[in-house]
Amino acid sequence: MRNCDIKFVNKEITPFGGLSLFFKMLEKCHFEEHVMQSGVPLQGSNRGYKPIQLILGLFAGVWCGASCFGHLDVVRYDAALCDLLGWERGADHRAYQRYLNKFSQAVNQRVFGNLFRCFFSELKFDNYTLDFDSTVMVREGSQEGAAKGYNPKRPGRLSHHPLLAFVSDVRMIANYWLRPGNTSASTNYLSFLEDTLSKLEGKRVGLVRMDSGFFAKEILDYLEMKGLHYIIACRFNNRIKYSLTHERKWIELTDGLEISETIYQANGWEKPRRIVMVRQEIDKRPKAAGKQIKQLELFEDEEDFGKYRYSCFVTDLDLPAKIVYDSYRGRADSENRIKELKNDFSIDDFVTNNFWATEACGNFIVMAYNFMSLFRHALINSNKKKFLKTIRYELISTPAYLGKTKDKHILYLARSLKTRQSFLSIWEKLKDFSLPYDTEKS
């Protein structure tokens, strides 16, 4: 490093000038108008921050890399960014928590039902694949709803256990419900499924995919009653294990991977259903997904089933078994969405002592995710869908300051000559961007 002194300048400069692109898109989406029409709680005092400022401040903080409420002060102390957004001052991080405490279960249902319905009604896609999953969010304190439950990575620790629904075709999240940590994957599943479909009203579901946590008679009956095609991973009870280990008509798809199918009727089912079975030889495919079946007296006549990992799916599709298996494998992308929510958007780190406030914050972060996904679809020219961390480095982290002429404001950006054109191309695209947006164009 050169030997030099330091001096400070009085000009207000933001390190996040690239956020101008995202807030311009939100303007084009009439986001503020939709928020105020959704029934969000209003402030009781004239001195309180407007709800839209707190919601946009949360978006900005998460997009810039905030990983807890305390980090939202990065927006508060960025005077240039606040000026760009037309705010007199930025909100203290405790103002976000106080506002979120106004949300209750009924308010969450009303607000996010309206916002999600409005968002998806402006996107053109149909005959889509809907994925359902749950995840574990570990808690370090004694927040409301934090309890000991299913937690494979940190057994015995308190956690929440939210449900999520994903629109696979557009890489967006259709629904988010927070649940206590001591609930199973199937708790509240029917209500969650109905709520998800209501948020996507007017669009046809082509396929529903679920993991084994949703393997239940009630959900199968509901999907069939609604005429929805499905593939659901089977929970491994003894009858399923027996069917897998006593199957003889295996067809080899590739070395170490075999597939078969049969008709199965569980106790309590009014009718039999088709199940597709897959087994993968561990020695040949050591990273294969599936479960190993341990030796039991019930299966003592079997000698070699322990060398396989098994998967099993119930479906109403009449497609070949291989296509059913390949179709279900695409559900793994929902795991990538969950990882992105946790790693890039820090959804599991924004937690309050109030359960419904935490759920409301999680839903706002999901909305920030969806708008970022829309931005990637509509405005970024790339065959690869870039993660938020990459977008943060390439676009958001752009030093800038706000200037003014006689009749307008000018945002001065500090970008290298090589990267100015890519930034300008997105800015020009924004001028033509409008809703409804056809996702098939991207």
Show the residue positions of the predicted features.
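Dynamic "connector" segments at or just before major functional cores
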Residues: 1-199, 399-442
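An anionic, glycine-rich sequence signature occurring as long contiguous blocks
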Residues: 2-4, 8, 229-343, 400, ...
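Short, solvent-exposed helix-loop connector elements
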Residues: 38-46, 321-328, 344-360, 376-387, ...
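Short amphipathic alpha-helical "interface-anchor" segments enriched in bulky aromatics
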Residues: 72, 136, 258, 321-355, ...
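Structural preference for beta-strand elements that scaffold enzyme active sites
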Residues: 127-131, 173, 205-209, 229-231
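Short, surface-exposed basic-aromatic patches at helix termini and helix-loop junctions that form
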Residues: 201, 220-229
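Acidic, metal-coordinating catalytic cores used for nucleic-acid/nucleotide bond scission
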Residues: 208-216, 236-239
